[in-house]
């Protein structure tokens, strides 16, 4: 039962972490793209 709970927490936290990193990196990418600083 503990393994199922831990796997559920891990599988639930991975998309949240990816979405959070994407949301924080996307405005910086857009700013750099507008300034043409690739």
UniProtKB/Swiss-Prot annotation:
GO MF annotations, alphabetized: electron transporter, transferring electrons within cytochrome b6/f complex of photosystem II activity
Annotated transmembrane regions: 5-25
Keywords: Chloroplast, Electron transport, Membrane, Photosynthesis, Plastid, Thylakoid, Transmembrane, Transmembrane helix, Transport
One Gene Ontology term, aspect cellular component: cytochrome b6f complex
HAMAP family recorded: Cytb6_f_PetG (MF_00432)
Subunit-structure text: The 4 large subunits of the cytochrome b6-f complex are cytochrome b6, subunit IV (17 kDa polypeptide, PetD), cytochrome f and the Rieske protein, while the 4 small subunits are PetG, PetL, PetM and PetN. The complex functions as a dimer.
Protein name as it appears in the record: Cytochrome b6-f complex subunit 5
Source organism (scientific name): Huperzia lucidula (Shining clubmoss)
